[in-house]
From Swiss-Prot:
Residues 15-111 are annotated as: Disordered. The gene is sepF. It comes from the Bacteria. Residues 44-57, 64-81, 91-111 have a biased composition (Polar residues). GO terms for cellular component: cytoplasm. InterPro entries: Cell_div_SepF (IPR023052), Cell_div_SepF/SepF-rel (IPR007561), SepF-like_sf (IPR038594). Cell division protein that is part of the divisome complex and is recruited early to the Z-ring. Probably stimulates Z-ring formation, perhaps through the cross-linking of FtsZ protofilaments. Its function overlaps with FtsA. This is Cell division protein SepF. It comes from Streptococcus uberis (strain ATCC BAA-854 / 0140J).
Length: 211
């Protein structure tokens, strides 16, 4: 009996060793299971990275579209050379118009500076008023009294002389029966011809012509 009990103890001992080995294998398997399951859970970050890798590709068209819209929204300016040419042409037109204006003004000034001399042969006293009207219009008048009598010529001459003083004109004798009436803006230089002064008494040295 004692021998049998010893055999049973030895058998039970070996049985417990097997059980312990089985338990150790089970615990080792359980410890290895999370290591095996981790690769199954890791695809989640890989999916996120793949999505992130796909997102830039999807975002690129939007960036290109935004750049295209910005380029479309930017104002289009003309070429600098064209703008310079337009400015130069505008300046040339302005200078041309200015030159034309100055030429026109110069021509107008020359025309205004021209002096007209009217030759009058008064035959009656009423003609003196027409001569004074010409003086008012800033015209020079050359008066020849050869068709008037002495008395009428003196009356007409006195009237014209008084009007010339009122209008700041000048009356000068240029011949035996001729007088030059000029406005204030005209000066006349007459050479000394020993002509008597018109303010002095004088007599006509020619035969008065009748009408």
């Amino acid at each position: 009996m004692a021998f049998k009990d010893a055999i049973n103890k030895m058998v039970s001992y070996f049985d417990t060793d097997e059980v312990n080995e089985v338990e150790e294998e089970v615990t080792a398997a359980k410890m290895e299971e999370p290591v095996v399951q981790e690769p199954k859970q890791r695809p989640i970050p890989s999916q996120q990275t793949s999505r992130q890798s796909q997102n830039p590709a999807m975002n690129r068209p939007t960036v290109a579209r935004s750049q295209q819209t910005e380029s479309d929204s930017l104002p289009t300016y003309p070429n600098r050379q064209e703008s310079i040419d337009r400015r130069s042409s505008g300046r040339e037109s302005v200078t041309a118009s200015t030159a034309r204006r100055e030429t026109y003004q110069a021509q107008t000034t020359v025309q205004e500076g021209k002096t007209t001399i009217a030759l009058k042969y008064p035959k009656k006293y009423e003609d003196a008023q027409e001569i004074v009207d010409l003086l008012i219009g800033n015209e020079c008048v050359l008066i020849d009294f050869q068709f008037m009598l002495d008395a009428q010529a003196r009356r007409c001459l006195d009237f014209i002389d008084g009007a010339s003083k009122v209008l700041y004109g000048t009356l000068q004798k240029v011949g035996s029966s001729m007088y030059l009436l000029t406005p204030s803006n005209v000066s006349v230089n007459i050479e000394d011809m020993n002509i008597p002064n018109h303010n002095q008494d004088f007599g006509y040295d020619f035969d008065m012509k009748r009408r």
